[in-house]
From Swiss-Prot:
Record protein name field: FMN-dependent NADH:quinone oxidoreductase 2
Top-level taxonomy: Bacteria, Bacillati, Bacillota, Bacilli, Bacillales
Record text on cofactor binding: Binds 1 FMN per subunit.
Pfam families in UniProt: Flavodoxin_2 (PF02525)
Temperature dependence: Activity increases linearly up to 40 degrees Celsius. Stable up to 55 degrees Celsius after incubation for 30 minutes at pH 7.5. During incubation at 25 degrees Celsius for 16h, the enzyme is stable between pH 5.5 and 9.0, where 80% activity is observed.
Means of activity regulation: Strongly inhibited by Pb(2+) and weakly inhibited by Cu(2+), Hg(2+) and Fe(2+). Stable in presence of Ag(+).
Reactions it catalyzes: 2 a quinone + NADH + H(+) = 2 a 1,4-benzosemiquinone + NAD(+); N,N-dimethyl-1,4-phenylenediamine + anthranilate + 2 NAD(+) = 2-(4-dimethylaminophenyl)diazenylbenzoate + 2 NADH + 2 H(+)
Signals that turn on the gene: Repressed by MhqR. Induced by thiol specific stress conditions, such as exposure to 2-methylhydroquinone (2-MHQ), catechol or diamide. Not induced by oxidative stress due to hydrogen peroxide or methylglyoxal.
GO terms (BP aspect): catabolic process; response to toxic substance
GO function terms (MF aspect): electron transfer activity; FMN binding; oxidoreductase activity, acting on NAD(P)H as acceptor; oxidoreductase activity, acting on NAD(P)H, quinone or similar compound as acceptor
SUPFAM superfamilies: Flavoproteins
Phenotype of gene-disrupted mutants: Deletion mutant is sensitive to 2-MHQ and catechol.
Amino acid sequence: MAKVLYITAHPHDEATSYSMATGKAFIESYKEANPNDEVVHIDLYKENIPHIDADVFSGWGKLQSGTGFEELSESEKAKVGRLGELSDQFASADKYVFVTPLWNFSFPPVMKAYLDSVAVAGKSFKYTEQGPVGLLTDKKAIHIQARGGYYSEGPAAEMEMGHRYIGIMMNFFGVPSFDGIFVEGHNAEPDKAQQIKEDAIARAKEAGKTF
């Protein structure tokens, strides 16, 4: 039985969000094909995702110097403890499904905060004499992203930094398989928006069967 993290970063639900609608189609198809797998939905707009701030750096520094966890301040314990929970959960999963919109050429900031929380030496990667090495070499990931314009090719392609960033992080973590499903062009061509959405959902359903 595999453990799947369904990680969404959108303030809207599938009724109004193209990425969330496509993500829902994917994960429902996946669950139908893999009824015994565990799927955990992490809604980044509802979960507590601490930003790495002064409390976190202070807490980490104290722990590294030998201070016990219970000796940290209340704010340090809350944030450092939560980051530990998130990184442990991420490292223990087998598959990752990321769902985001493309906002200002990237993704909502809460996704960056989440990726920061799981980029932990000793869990998702390790340091060696040859440099950092990813530890999640038996995992797979997919990113479902809605883009109002066209970013797969043409002059705007180099401006897309959301999917590319997640791909870079997965590569850094050692994840050998990273794919994408894109819903694009619905704002550029609103008369085709419904068909664009339906086509993406169809592709998502097929991909979910074999993920």
